[in-house]
């Protein structure tokens, strides 16, 4: 049985706890931490875990894996401390890995400790095919993400865009994955997953659509294998419209696979 520690007790952590209770994961949540203690207390209504008051204390528990569900800013600390305490780690706030220096640092720490960093596929499809294609040559990776205006509201306000003036599908960003994750840190983690899988930086376009009711991700990858095209329209989580249900399911599936005798997919 997988012994799990969770850092960040929000929507995804709650869905993991429910999946364990429904026997979809052969595991148990041993320890929890959130900088807002009330969130840890709320999540612990679904578990029988130890509530820790720091990341340092959580990583010292007897765990097989630590799941980061907190924020991009927390990734370096969570991953570094988990790996150095001989724990595998899952990074949900994968946007942090757009930082090349941090990526290289965590790669080395994981390698030195003979542990793994897991990056779930998140809210997109085709990651297995793209990883496989990267064995050959990939020439181009592009992502067009369309989201409801309310799902992008915080980032748009930070850019000085008045969302009340958006009355039709509007391109609010076009550029590299590196700039995309800086301007939309809570909305475009999938672009970093795509870039890691393909090993080349994705070209990103973000569209705010006032009529949209789901998050849509269109991916085109071209290379020596030909062309890969995928389109996913994700329903949001009921409890948090900024989180796609598929993103939460991807980490649940990953945890399930870690204890499965047969694993399908690359």
Swiss-Prot record:
Q: What class of enzyme is it?
A: oxidoreductase
Q: Which Gene3D superfamilies match?
A: Dihydrodipicolinate Reductase, domain 2, NAD(P)-binding Rossmann-like Domain
Q: Which Pfam families match?
A: Asp_DH_C (PF01958), NAD_binding_3 (PF03447)
What GO MF terms are annotated? aspartate dehydrogenase activity; NAD binding; NADP binding; oxidoreductase activity, acting on the CH-NH2 group of donors, NAD or NADP as acceptor
- The annotated active site, in chain numbering, is 217
Q: In which pathway does it act?
A: Cofactor biosynthesis; NAD(+) biosynthesis; iminoaspartate from L-aspartate (dehydrogenase route): step 1/1
Sites where the protein binds NAD(+): 123, 189
Task: Report the EC number(s), separated by commas if there are several.
Answer: 1.4.1.21
Q: What else is known?
A: The iminoaspartate product is unstable in aqueous solution and can decompose to oxaloacetate and ammonia.
Matching entries from PANTHER family are given as: ASPARTATE DEHYDROGENASE DOMAIN-CONTAINING PROTEIN (PTHR31873:SF6), L-ASPARTATE DEHYDROGENASE-RELATED (PTHR31873)
Similarity comment: family membership: Belongs to the L-aspartate dehydrogenase family.
Q: What is this protein called?
A: L-aspartate dehydrogenase
The species this protein belongs to is Methanococcus aeolicus (strain ATCC BAA-1280 / DSM 17508 / OCM 812 / Nankai-3)
